[in-house]
């Protein structure tokens, strides 16, 4: 078993460049966490705002398939560059939209372009880092994400109380910065697509991979829960009488906890078989969100954030490394694209269904979160032939 210091030293320089660029991009994720609040402020209903967030999820779904294919075909770096510059342009266009149809269309396009990089980034980490160091590498990758996430929403919350336009400008600017970093400092990564490969071959291989299918189903369940953070959780905080900055600080608490504790937790979880750790994390996430319905004070809301964040810290680095482990090298980008597709479906299903239920029976949202958390844990622990 390698020590934590050994694992850190084993990571190559390009991996650290990827982590740094990811931090910059994640810090600038200003708009999507506040999209529900922005749209309701300019006059749209909660249901309409939830549908717009679902459109972002549809774009995410398109990006999951296209991003995985592009990562294997044109290289990891080129896919990241395309994603960053394209998303900056679409985000600036979205900032100027006021009619509902253009907002939904541009949100979908922004979702596709801004999420196109994810399969490529995960695949590039898998290319650069050997299996024995991947859990640590993905832990640091998530640390970069959550360092940005700790500072970004808190900054965005204060900006949003003055001008939502600043959120769009900041989001686009950080994407452009990461685009240039990727263009000049990242390696191409593997190109594993071959012209002789039959159409849909990677999908057929994945469909016969029972452990991978169980993992995909569990991922879909828990991501439907996770995406309540930017939709019904925001509405619940506002319904409890708190301003946007309180929601921003609660979201940033998630990132700060991960920054402080996840790498230490990762060094513990990597000692065990991945499936029980993923199941435990998914269960804690479901329970944490389920308790939100009972939380109407800031301390109680903070407690729920701590519980589901603990679940995220236990499961997420292990889950990503597990997906890379299951993926054959020649299909790595597309396997990870399928994982991202489950995240996309969770975003498509979660916010619209959650906001619709919230308007009619808020308690049903939090009960469903608990049930989905239990289901996802059970899928990960299911015996496989």
Residues of each region from the PLM?
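Cytoplasmic helix-loop-helix junction between adjacent transmembrane helices
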Residues: 107-145
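Helix-loop junctions at membrane interfaces in 12-TM secondary transporters
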Residues: 95-106, 293-304
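Juxtamembrane intracellular "pre-TM" segments in multi-pass secondary transporters
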Residues: 1-12, 187-217
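Structural signature of the two symmetry-related core transmembrane helices
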Residues: 78-92, 276-290
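Helix-to-loop junctions at the C-terminal end of transmembrane segments
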Residues: 63-75, 261-274, 358
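Residue-level signature of mid-helix packing/kink "hotspots" within the transmembrane helices
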Residues: 30, 57-65, 149-150, 255-259, ...
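Helix-loop boundary and gating motifs at the non-cytosolic
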Residues: 8-57, 213-218, 222-250
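Helix-loop junctions on the cytosolic side of multi-pass membrane transporters
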Residues: 127, 182-196, 382-385
């Amino acid at each position: 078993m390698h020590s934590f210091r050994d694992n850190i030293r084993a990571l190559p320089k390009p991996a650290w460049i990827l982590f740094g660029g990811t931090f910059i991009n994640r810090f600038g994720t200003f708009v999507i966490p506040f999209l529900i609040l922005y749209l309701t402020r300019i006059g749209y209903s909660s249901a309409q705002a939830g549908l717009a967030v679902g459109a972002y999820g549809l774009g995410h779904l398109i990006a999951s398939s296209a991003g995985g294919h592009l990562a294997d075909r044109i290289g990891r770096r080129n896919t990241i560059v395309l994603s960053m510059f394209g998303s900056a342009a679409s985000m600036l266009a979205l900032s100027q939209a006021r009619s509902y149809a253009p907002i939904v269309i541009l949100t979908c396009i922004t979702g596709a372009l801004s999420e196109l990089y994810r399969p490529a980034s995960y695949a590039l980490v898998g290319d650069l880092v050997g299996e024995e160091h991947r859990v640590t590498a993905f832990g640091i990758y998530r640390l970069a994400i959550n360092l940005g996430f700790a500072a970004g929403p808190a900054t965005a919350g204060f900006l949003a109380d003055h001008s939502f336009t600043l959120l769009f400008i900041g989001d686009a600017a950080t994407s452009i910065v990461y685009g240039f970093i990727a263009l000049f400092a990242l390696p191409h990564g593997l190109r594993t697509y071959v012209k002789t490969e039959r159409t849909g071959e990677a999908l057929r291989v994945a469909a016969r991979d029972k452990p991978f299918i169980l993992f995909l189903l569990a991922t879909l369940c828990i991501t439907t829960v996770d995406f309540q953070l930017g939709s019904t959780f925001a509405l619940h905080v506002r319904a409890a009488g708190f301003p946007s900055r309180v929601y921003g600080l609660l979201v940033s608490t998630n990132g700060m906890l991960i920054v402080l504790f996840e790498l230490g937790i990762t060094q513990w979880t990597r000692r065990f078989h991945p499936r029980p750790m993923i199941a435990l994390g998914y269960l804690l996430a479901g329970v944490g969100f389920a308790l939100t319905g009972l939380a109407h004070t800031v301390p109680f809301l903070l407690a729920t954030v701590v519980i589901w964040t603990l679940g995220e810290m236990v499961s997420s680095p292990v889950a990503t490394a597990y997906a890379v482990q299951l993926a054959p090298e020649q299909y790595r980008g597309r396997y990870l694209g399928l994982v991202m597709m489950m995240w996309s479906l969770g975003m498509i299903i979660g916010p619209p269904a959650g906001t619709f239920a919230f308007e009619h029976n808020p308690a049903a949202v939090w009960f469903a979160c608990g049930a989905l958390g239990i289901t996802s844990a059970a899928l990960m622990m299911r015996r496989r032939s």
